[in-house]
Design a protein with these regions (language model features):
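General small-molecule cofactor/ligand-binding pocket signal
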Residues: 156-159
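AMP-binding/adenylate-forming catalytic core of the ANL superfamily
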Residues: 22, 38, 43-44, 66-151, ...
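Conserved AMP-binding/adenylate-forming
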Residues: 1-74, 81-84, 97-98
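Short acidic/His-enriched helical or mixed secondary-structure segments at domain edges of catalytic enzymes
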Residues: 164
Length: 181
């Protein structure tokens, strides 16, 4: 069986699990924190005990990614743990919203972050660069037809180009700073 959105199955000698924030294994097709261990997996970071404490727990390495394993053992990446938005007590994965926005023919790039909210704890904000004109209300309507209501961005900010690092990856911390200024 082939799963084009999967990164594949774990290699021989590496155990991969999807776990809750309490380190409890989750059932198949449930999004959670990825952890893995094996003979070739380090037990810590060299000369960095603070980072080691954050990333290693009871012999498992936590790379900071969210994902799920299907029934066949294929791993699907769903985003970064630190990027997860908790809105009204519900975990929301920005990657799903970003992919939805990217499916609109007018959108060139998209990044989703959170902003504090008195009502929900966190609210969803999307930063978008366009390749064709579209209004923020039309993009929000597009999201409403493709996402659950609680995943629809409250605000869409347009930019000519999203900030990127030297590797071409969008720098969400810069977007957060721009939003708070």
């Amino acid at each position: 069986m082939h799963f084009p959105d999967s990164v594949g199955r774990p290699i021989f000698g590496v155990d991969v699990q999807i776990v809750s924030e309490e380190h409890q294994p989750l059932s198949a097709n449930t999004v959670g924190r990825i952890r893995y261990k094996g003979m070739a997996v380090s037990s810590g970071f060299y000369n960095d005990p603070e980072s080691s404490l954050e990333s290693f727990h009871e012999g498992w390495f936590y790379p900071g990614d969210l994902g799920l394993l299907n029934e066949e053992g294929y791993l699907f990446l769903k985003g970064r743990f630190k990027d997860m938005i908790i809105r009204g007590g519900i975990n929301i994965y920005p990657l799903e919203i970003e992919n939805t926005l990217m499916n609109n023919h007018c959108v060139s790039e998209a990044a989703v972050i959170s902003t504090p909210s008195k009502e929900f704890g966190e609210e969803i904000v999307a930063f978008v660069s366009l390749k064709a004109p579209i209004s923020s209300s039309d993009l929000i309507d597009f999201c409403k037809t493709h996402l659950a209501p609680y995943k629809v961005p409250k605000l869409i900010q347009f930019m000519d180009q999203l900030p990127k690092n030297s590797g071409g990856k969008i720098v969400k911390s810069q977007l957060s700073k721009m939003l708070n200024n």
